[in-house]
Each structure stands twice: as C-alpha cells, then as structure tokens.
Amino acid sequence: MISQQAHNLWSRRAFLKVSLVGMALIGSRLALPDWASAEALPEGRLRLFNVNSQERLTVRYRNRLGRYDQTALQDINYFLRCYHSDQVCQMDVQLLEYLNQILSLVGQGKEVRVFSAYRSPTYNNLLVRLGRGAVPKSLHTTGQAMDIAIPGVRLSQVRRTAQMLKLGGVGNYARRGFIHLDTGPVRYW
C-alpha cells in the first residue's frame, strides 16, 4: 500500500503526463499511450453550474482512454462563455483537466459552481475600469482561468489541493466565495 503523499505525487505526475499528451491529441481520435491508460486517468467528467446564467451542464469531455469528445468540448466552451457579451472562447483543455484532477481528490461527482470563466477583453477592461478586481492581462480573456467553488468542500481544501498540484495559478478569494484557478505560471495569492 502506498502512502497518501506518494499517491498524491504519483497522481500529480500522471496528470502532468496525461495533460501534455492530451493537448497533443486534442484534435485526434488516437488513444493515449499505455502509461496514461485507465489506471492513470480519471474519466473526464464534469458537473457544472454557472452562477451567472443559472445553467447546468453535466458532460464527459474525455473517456478513460484519453479520447476527447469535440462536441462536449464545444458545449463546455459555450457554457463557460462571457456572460456579459455572450462571446465564446476555446477553453484551455489543461484547465478542464486541472479542475477534474482537483475533483478526483476532494469532490468526485460533485457539482462545481462557476463564478467566472471566459471574459471578453472588452468586458475584462470594463471590470478593470470599475475596480472590480480584474487585471488588464487576465488569463480569463484567453480561456485559461476559472473562478469556482465546490459545494460541500471547504474553499481552503480546494485551494490547498490546487496548490499541491502545482499546475498553475491559485487565487484565494474566500471572502467573495470562490477560488481562482488558471493554467498560467505556478503562483499563489
């Protein structure tokens, strides 16, 4: 039996390998190599609730063999659109995998509340001008960021898990009720 720390390290390494290969295969119908097969990879399934549009989406975007469902990815892109302008952006698949990895560790099967995902540059600039906490070169404008909460899981637990994975930025906005995740450089605030 492996320790929890070793399991977490193995999971993180497997996730990183799978993410890199997954990005390379995004448009293909090829399966992942054996080292990234069913044992190393939880199925890419998400249950999402958009707090702005009040929409729900339950979707399997990747099977356990690593095949991405292009229709499901398009559904996710639309679901995570800029709610201010209705513009759609291709979301970073690594962001979906990051969220899926967090869920596999702290909230498998739970619904994720999405407070913000893609923001059009125009809307982001408006938020900057209004002093609403947005930054000028936000990764939200490139589909690489998402602000989330997982009902039934403490925000501190989501934050610690995301930080442990070291897959991108993690912002603590507990007073506003969410955690920021992005696929930019590893950093915490």
PLM regions and their residue ranges:
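Extracytoplasmic/secreted envelope proteins and their assembly/folding machinery
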Residues: 96-100, 124, 155, 159
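C-terminal segment of N-terminal export signals and the immediately downstream linker at the start
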Residues: 29-59
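Active-site-proximal beta-strand/loop segments in catalytic clefts of secreted hydrolases
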Residues: 51, 62, 115-119, 151, ...
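Charged, often glycine-rich, active-site loop that binds/positions anionic groups
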Residues: 121-138
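Acidic helix-start/capping segments at beta-turn-to-alpha-helix junctions
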Residues: 111-125
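Catalytic cores and adjacent binding grooves of peptidoglycan-active enzymes
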Residues: 2-3, 9, 19, 38-39, ...
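N-terminal export signals
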Residues: 2-8, 14-35
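Active-site acidic/histidine clusters and adjacent loop/turn architecture
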Residues: 65-115
